């Protein structure tokens, strides 16, 4: 077991009841193009087309052969594009239950599948996009070979779902998915299954699966943390990672021949009336999913964690491909008298400069950052929440200044935006380090 000490479990109110309920019915789903780093689509459909579940919507021009499929059957009602014609979302009005079928196998055949059989089924169904690479967090090329594959079966994000609750309903599907993954490279690559201590995660002694437990505060449950401690990456070495619900979907694909797009997400946060786990589907319209669920007032719905999720509004008002939670907090627009110096008891700070830092209560966090952006202040805040073996203050300084050579030497290739979310949260200068990291990674990938 690997135990980390640095980190922070955010004391936010609205923790979900760990019981799965059926969510609101949604009649719109979407594929969000901007989730896929560096992807340039070649569209295979247009507005007004009727598509089946599992039908190809577009292909990545820059990653030949990688296709993105419809999460539900229905009519294409919108193809939204932003600046420079960047694909924002492909929206489907859900109608009917027609679907494309794929190769299916008996459970007893899974352990003898060839790498080509596994890859072909994953690619054709669109489930290849469940994989992401580290470094760069991109969908891998079809001819890429990772050092290993990481399956994340734990979650320490604020307000997260307990994976064990979901896996209890799909034990055999999860084991089938692990078996399929173990055959992706003919059994030559280790599958690292990362879980919480004492969790009852099924493995059924699948070949090439190595189980590692992680303990400690967030970010103990992030894939970036797991990769750093088990099989760290570099500019010449990569690994792939995916979450446990996609492993379930892979297991179901190979045993049923059908694309499984159900998702169990936590619907939680200070502004949710009844925080709980809800069953919905990939790409669900979040306005419909949260209808009647939220407290009065101006709320921000987030696809993903409050620390690193995406604001769900307008053309982005849908559950993301990699999101396992929907978080809701209030928009913090109120001005507070003497807000910088009053020792409030209803506020939280890692620096213990407010009375609330000394209590163990949960706080109704809002979107307010309590100050304007300013220079970095190196007072040890970053070191308190960064468990990885890097120098966070120096790394963040280099990211802010655009010095990619130094940032690469300090370990930025190991990171994804979510790995710096706590640094952003505790930053006295109110800096957002996620876009700085992405700009650095893009530059390194392009220029070396």
From Swiss-Prot:
Keywords: Ion transport, NAD, Sodium, Sodium transport, Translocase, Transport, Ubiquinone. NQR complex catalyzes the reduction of ubiquinone-1 to ubiquinol by two successive reactions, coupled with the transport of Na(+) ions from the cytoplasm to the periplasm. NqrA to NqrE are probably involved in the second step, the conversion of ubisemiquinone to ubiquinol. Belongs to the NqrA family. The keyword tRNA processing does not apply. GO terms for molecular function: oxidoreductase activity, acting on NAD(P)H, quinone or similar compound as acceptor. It comes from Glaesserella parasuis serovar 5 (strain SH0165). GO terms for biological process: sodium ion transport. HAMAP family: NqrA. InterPro entries: NqrA (IPR008703), NQRA_2nd (IPR056148), NqrA_C_domain (IPR022615), NQRA_N (IPR056147). The keyword Transmembrane helix does not apply. This is Na(+)-translocating NADH-quinone reductase subunit A. It holds the Pfam family NQRA_N. Its EC number is 7.2.1.1. It catalyses: a ubiquinone + n Na(+)(in) + NADH + H(+) = a ubiquinol + n Na(+)(out) + NAD(+).
């Amino acid at each position: 077991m690997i135990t980390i000490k640095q980190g922070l479990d955010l004391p936010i109110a609205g923790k979900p009841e760990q019981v799965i309920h059926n969510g609101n019915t949604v009649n719109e789903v979407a594929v969000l193009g901007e989730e896929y780093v560096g992807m340039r689509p070649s569209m295979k459909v247009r507005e007004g087309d009727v598509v089946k579940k599992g039908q190809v919507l577009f292909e990545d021009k820059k990653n030949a052969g990688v296709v993105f499929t419809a999460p539900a059957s229905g009519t294409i009602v919108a193809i939204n594009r932003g600046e420079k014609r960047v694909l924002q979302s492909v929206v489907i009005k859900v109608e009917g239950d027609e679907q494309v079928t794929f190769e299916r196998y008996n459970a007893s055949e899974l352990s003898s599948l060839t790498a080509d059989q596994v890859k072909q089924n994953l690619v054709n169904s669109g489930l290849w996009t469940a994989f992401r690479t580290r470094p760069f967090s991109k969908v891998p090329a079809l001819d890429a070979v990772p050092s290993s594959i990481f399956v994340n079966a734990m979650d320490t994000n604020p307000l997260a779902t307990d994976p064990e609750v979901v896996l209890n309903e799909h034990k055999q599907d999860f084991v089938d998915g692990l078996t399929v993954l173990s055959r992706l490279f003919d059994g030559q690559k280790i599958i690292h299954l990362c879980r919480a201590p004492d969790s009852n995660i099924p493995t059924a002694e699948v070949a090439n699966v190595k189980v590692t437990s992680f303990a400690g505060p967030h970010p103990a449950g992030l894939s970036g943390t797991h990769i750093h401690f088990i099989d760290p990456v570099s500019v010449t070495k990569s690994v792939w990672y995916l979450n446990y619900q996609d492993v379930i979907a892979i297991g179901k694909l190979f045993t049923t021949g059908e694309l499984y797009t159900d998702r169990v997400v936590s619907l939680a946060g200070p502004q949710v009336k009844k925080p709980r786990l809800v069953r919905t589907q990939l790409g669900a319209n979040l306005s419909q999913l949260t209808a009647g669920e939220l407290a009065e007032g101006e709320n921000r719905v987030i696809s993903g964690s409050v620390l690193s999720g995406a604001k769900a509004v307008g053309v982005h008002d849908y559950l993301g491909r990699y999101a396992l939670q929907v978080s809701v907090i209030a928009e913090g627009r109120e001005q507070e008298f003497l807000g910088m110096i009053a020792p409030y008891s209803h506020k939280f700070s890692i620096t213990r400069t407010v009375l609330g830092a000394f209590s163990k209560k949960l706080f109704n966090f809002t979107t307010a950052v309590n100050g304007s952006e300013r220079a970095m202040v190196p007072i040890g805040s970053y070191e308190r929440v960064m468990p990885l073996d890097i120098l966070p203050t120096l790394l963040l300084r280099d990211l802010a200044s655009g010095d990619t050579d130094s940032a690469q030497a300090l370990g930025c290739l190991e990171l994804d935006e979510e790995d710096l979310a706590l640094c952003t949260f505790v930053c006295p200068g109110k800096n957002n380090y996620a876009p700085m990291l992405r700009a650095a990674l893009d530059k390194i990938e392009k220029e070396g």
